[in-house]
């Protein structure tokens, strides 16, 4: 029956590539400013779309100011939602610390949720606040990816682009059209789209039930396309009003990685060599496939505690088998395992099953995918430029081995670039490890744990890995709505996002000044199986050296203990 999981993974990858290829071609027009003439004429009448080129410092300042202003407005919207319209359930104002945490979460594309959406936020807060920032945070990540692409393929300090123009075009010409089509499809499939607060129906026991509704389809579309992940409902994509059918589940999985995959194809075309984009796509695809198969295998083994209770966990024609705790029967084991892989490989964080109920090894894989820096496809834009940091490190190490100055696409990778690469690669793991250590030492952190021992440590490690790498998913046994967790995780989300984004922009600013050097016999070919293997090795080596000690205290020891005692 494992063949069913392999077939699902294979069909998923084929559909993803078929859809990503034309989208990647379309994205090259946004990178290269090749728009239809009529659009250029329309933009010429919009004052802030004067396409004056920015230096990297100006671009970075624009991104920071834009996001800080957005966070302030979102914070105020939630802080005073009780006095604002479109609040049919008369939900109270959100507490200041939770509002601050949520605002930072959504501007950083993390979408960490320390609240239940249907009982905490009004439709106005969900639509005007969260949904808007789902678009803007995604556009910010893609814009920074565009800047690095231009830096690698152009020469001249005034060729990096304009932040306002990039964000406008990405939002209006890419994200909005795709989201409208996607939302209509979701609504047709049964995803709720209503301004009604709730509907009352008689339950099976005769007691009236109040079922919350809301403008879900419109938020769900960009939630997945923008690798945001924050659900309208607390159950996220496990909720039938967000993800009702096997078809919507498959489409949601494809939509998570659609833009990240398309950016790899786009990069190859912008660089004038499709092979460099394909190398990144192969690297990410191999790592994703291996991770998915590992989770499927781990979950298919079942749970030893349930086995001792004589619970039937065997696969058959009438049940998925394996560890079905925390999973929806309409999706089954294979689709739930693949979704868990995809959502943590990307910085999405949406879930269609409870990750806290995964087996120890099944929960280990999503944790590792986040700890690698969200570079296995990763978030829209951020996954691509995060992987490029590893690419620069790989060519640097290769250059050291053969005694040549490292270069990529004909541009030399020198001391300044490697300093920025080091900063970008070290900040997220440092935040994860220091934050986790602080949380398990201080009583203010320990009060959030409902579990003790290895699993309790795993819950805390997962939370800080998710926040620092802007994923947003969680092991749900952790109570994160405390002053300590709200403040600490907000700091991690902000620094984890901009602590990587700013070094990437600095690298772009340095590379744009350099001229392309012609390739020689000693130049490293940045494509082909050898380069893909080297890149995978560097990514795994950095992750293994950094996190194996922490993982040994959590999921690894939990697995050994669980299977030994049962």
UniProtKB/Swiss-Prot annotation:
One of its GO terms (molecular function) is potassium ion binding. One of its GO terms (cellular component) is plasma membrane. It comes from the Bacteria. It is found in: Cell inner membrane. It is a multi-pass membrane protein. Its main location: membrane. InterPro entries: KdpA. Part of the high-affinity ATP-driven potassium transport (or Kdp) system, which catalyzes the hydrolysis of ATP coupled with the electrogenic transport of potassium into the cytoplasm. This subunit binds the periplasmic potassium ions and delivers the ions to the membrane domain of KdpB through an intramembrane tunnel. This is Potassium-transporting ATPase potassium-binding subunit. It comes from Tolumonas auensis (strain DSM 9187 / NBRC 110442 / TA 4).
């Amino acid at each position: 029956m494992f063949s069913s999981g392999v077939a699902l993974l294979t069909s998923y990858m084929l559909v993803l590539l078929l859809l990503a290829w034309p989208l990647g071609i379309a994205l090259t027009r946004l990178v290269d400013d090749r728009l239809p003439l009529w659009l250029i004429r329309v933009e010429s009448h919009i004052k802030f779309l004067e396409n004056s080129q920015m230096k990297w410092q100006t671009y970075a300042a624009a991104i920071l100011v834009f996001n800080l202003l957005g966070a302030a407005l979102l914070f105020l919207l939630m802080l005073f939602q009780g006095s604002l319209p479109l609040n049919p359930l008369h939900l109270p104002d959100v507490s200041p610390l939770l509002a601050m945490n949520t605002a930072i979460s959504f501007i950083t594309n993390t979408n960490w949720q320390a609240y239940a959406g249907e009982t905490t936020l009004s439709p106005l807060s969900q639509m005007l606040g969260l949904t808007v920032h789902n678009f803007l945070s995604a556009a910010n990540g893609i814009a920074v990816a565009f800047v690095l692409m231009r830096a690698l393929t152009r020469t001249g300090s005034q060729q990096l682009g304009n932040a306002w123009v990039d964000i406008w075009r990405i939002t209006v010409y890419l994200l909005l059209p795709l989201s409208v089509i996607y939302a209509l499809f979701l609504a047709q499939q049964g995803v709720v789209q209503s301004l009604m607060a709730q509907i009352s129906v008689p339950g099976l026991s005769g007691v009236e039930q109040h079922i919350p509704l809301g403008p879900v389809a419109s938020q769900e579309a960009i939630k997945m396309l923008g690798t945001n992940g924050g659900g309208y409902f607390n159950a996220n994509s496990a909720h039938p009003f967000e993800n009702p059918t096997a078809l919507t589940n498959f489409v949601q999985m494809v939509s998570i990685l659609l833009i990240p995959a398309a950016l790899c194809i786009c990069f190859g075309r912008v660089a004038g060599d499709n092979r460099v984009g394909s190398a990144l796509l192969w690297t990410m695809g191999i790592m994703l496939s291996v991770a998915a198969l590992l989770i499927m295998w781990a979950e298919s083994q079942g749970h030893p505690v349930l086995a001792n209770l004589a619970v039937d966990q065997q696969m058959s024609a009438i049940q998925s088998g394996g560890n079905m705790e925390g999973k929806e029967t309409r999706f089954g084991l294979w689709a739930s395992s693949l979704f868990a892989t995809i959502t943590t490989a990307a910085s999405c964080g949406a879930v269609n099953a409870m990750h806290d109920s995964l087996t120890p090894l099944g929960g280990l894989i999503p944790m590792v995918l986040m700890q690698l820096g969200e570079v296995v496809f990763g978030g829209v834009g951020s996954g691509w430029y995060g992987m490029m940091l590893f690419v620069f490190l790989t060519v640097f190490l290769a250059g050291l081995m053969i005694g040549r100055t490292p270069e990529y696409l004909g541009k030399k990778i020198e001391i300044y670039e490697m300093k920025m690469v080091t900063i970008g690669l070290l900040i997220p793991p440092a935040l994860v490890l220091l934050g986790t250590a602080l949380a398990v030492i201080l009583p203010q952190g320990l009060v959030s744990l409902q579990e003790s021992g290895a699993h309790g440590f795993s819950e805390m490690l997962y939370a800080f890995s998710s926040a620092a790498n802007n994923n947003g998913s969680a092991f749900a046994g952790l109570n994160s709505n405390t002053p300590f967790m709200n403040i600490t995780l907000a700091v991690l989300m902000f620094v984890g996002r901009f602590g990587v984004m700013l070094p990437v922009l600095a690298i772009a600013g340095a590379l744009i000044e350099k001229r392309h050097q012609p390739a020689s016999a000693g130049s490293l070919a940045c494509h082909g199986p050898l380069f893909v293997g080297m890149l995978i090795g560097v990514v795994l080596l950095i992750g293994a050296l950094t996190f194996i000690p922490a993982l040994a205290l959590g999921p690894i020891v939990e697995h050994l203990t669980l299977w030994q005692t049962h």
